[in-house]
Amino acid sequence: KKVTAVDTKGKRYRIQERLRDLENILPSYFIRINKSTLANEHRIERFVAVFNGGVDAVFRCGYREYVSRRCFSQIRRRYEGI
């Protein structure tokens, strides 16, 4: 079974839940940003374009993570209604 790492407030946990299952359990402010990452949207400071035409999510702590094109288009649609 696949192991998932969870980073929270500087601590790392390993759990055996699949991301798909976590996505259904976690509150709606946890969003998928790529195939292997769920992120708390409240901790994302901004999205930035990168040299290859892609997008990175920049977190308040300074960490950066690649955002897939598919996920970014879903994130944009989510905020277009606001």
PLM regions and their residue ranges:
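Basic, polyanion-interacting recognition surfaces, primarily
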Residues: 1-82
